[in-house]
Amino acid sequence: SADLEYRFYDGNFRRPQQGESGNNVVFDTEGGGKVKDFFAWGSFNYSRDKVKEANFNSSIIDPYRGMPYYTADTNVSNWNNQHYRLKMRVATPQFWNFLSFGLDGYYQNSVGAKQRDMRTKSVFYTIIVRPGVVLSAGKNHRFGLDFEYASVREDLEMKAVNSYVEQTYYLLSGLGMATETSGIQRFLTYNGNQVGGGLQYNYAGRMNILLDLGYSKKVEDAITTPTSPRYLGTTKDGLWSGKLMAYIPDAKKNTHFVEMNWQERKIDGIEYLQKWETDGEEGEYKVYYKSIRSTYKTQTMSLDYRYVINRGMEYSWKLGAGVKYWKQEERY
C-alpha cells in the first residue's frame, strides 16, 4: 500500500520552537508477505517539513526529544527538515512446536536547516535493533522476551553568513538556565547509546490477553567539536513501560477491546566543571567535577475501551471511550 498526504497548521496555541505556521508532505508505503515459512514486513516513510517563524532553537532538529543541552537565539527563523524512515520485521516459523524468533529494525535519517543567522545545518540518525524470542507453553500460553539496542547521533554546524557581525546566542541547560555567548561559527555533536528489553505474556483462549513490560536506558553526550572537545552536558534517560490488551468476544459474537498503558520516564541532566589545560603545545578541556543538576520526570497512564458490532469479517458499528492521565515534574 502507498499513501501521500499534505498537512498544514497555523495558530498561536503552540510552543515557540514549533513555529507560527508550517506544512509537511508525507509519503508512506508498506508491504508484507510470507517467504517460504518466514513472515516479513517493511515500510518506508518520507516527510518534508517547513517550519515557519520558529524561535529559541538554533541547533537540533527536534528540541523536544529529551535533550536539554542545545543552543537558542532570538532571531525568528524558518526551518526546512527532511526525514527518511525505514522499518522492517521478520518472524520465523515455530521450531520444535514451541520456539520461534523475530527481529524488528528501525532506521531514521534526518536533515535540517535553519534559514537565518545563526544558520544551522544538522544531520541526525538513529538505528534500533530489537531481536526477540517466543516460547509456547501448551495451546493457550505464550511467553516472550526481547532485547533492544539503539544508537543515536546528531552532528551540526552553526554558521553566520554575515561574518562581520557576531551573533548572540545561548547555551541552554534546561528549565530556563542559559549561558550567553557570541560568535560566527560553532560545531556540536550529540552521541548516544540505548539498551533495553521487555517481557511479554499472552493468553489465547476464549479471550485473548497480552501483557507487555519493558525498560530502556539511554545515555547521550552533548559535545562541542571538532578541535577542542568540551562537554555541554549528558543525559541519562530511563523509561519504564507497561501495556495490557484484552480482546473479549461476547455471547452475541460482538467484541470488547480493552487497552491499558502506563509509562514512566526520568531524565537526569548532568553538567560538568571543566578547565582548559595545556601540556606543551597541546591542550584539552579536563573534567574536574560532574553532577546531576536537573531532573525531568514524566508519568502517563491511559485506559481505552471499544465495543465493536461485527458484520462478518468487518464491523457495522464501533463505539469507544478513553481517559488519560499525564503528570510532569521538572527540577533544577
Enumerate the predicted regions with their spans.
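Membrane-embedded beta-strand positions of outer-membrane beta-barrel proteins
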Residues: 2-4, 42-44, 101-105, 131, ...
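Transmembrane beta-strands of outer-membrane beta-barrel pores
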Residues: 4-10, 46-50, 94, 105-111, ...
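Outer-membrane beta-barrel translocator domains and adjoining extracellular loop/strand segments
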Residues: 12-19, 53-59, 112-120, 156-162, ...
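Short sequence motifs at beta-strands and strand-loop junctions characteristic
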Residues: 19-23, 74-83, 121-125, 187-193, ...
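Short, flexible helix-coil linker/hinge segments at the edges of structured domains or between repeats
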Residues: 56-70, 148-191, 217-234, 274-281
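Exposed, low-structure sequence patches enriched in small/polar residues
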Residues: 191-221, 235-332
